[in-house]
Regions:
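Thiamine diphosphate
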Residues: 1-118
Length: 118
């Protein structure tokens, strides 16, 4: 069981693509549009029952939405958190889709991680 928390229009599109790919394989994660980084929706997070929490954001990993979610669940041993976003490195030039894929934000990469870790 898995929930994907996506923050940002492009991240939501990537996460939805991963859900479609997983659905073709019989895996059906929940997908939540997080809509904003702060304040965190504590009520939503407290109600998550899935053991695997995947965040997808069109943002930097350090100090981003996923970092806040990981911090929130740091003491909760029943949850594993995986963050998909941009690493702390120079990102080259190119089309947005190409750059997101290069940074590991492709629907295929997200789906592969989830399929391997559920």
């Amino acid at each position: 069981r898995c929930v994907i928390l996506a923050c940002g229009e492009r991240a939501i599109a990537r996460a939805a693509g991963a859900c479609r790919l997983l659905g073709e394989r019989g895996v059906f994660p929940s997908l939540v549009n997080a809509r904003f980084v702060k304040p965190l929706d504590e009520e939503l997070l407290a109600g998550l029952e899935e053991p695997l929490v995947v965040t997808v954001e069109d943002n930097m990993l350090a100090g981003g939405f996923g970092s806040l979610v990981a911090e929130r669940f740091a003491e909760d041993t029943s949850k594993r958190v995986k963050i998909f976003g941009y690493g702390d490195k120079f990102i080259g030039q190119g089309g947005i889709d190409e750059l997101m894929d290069d940074c590991g934000l492709s629907p295929e990469a997200i789906a592969a991680y989830i399929e391997k870790n559920i």
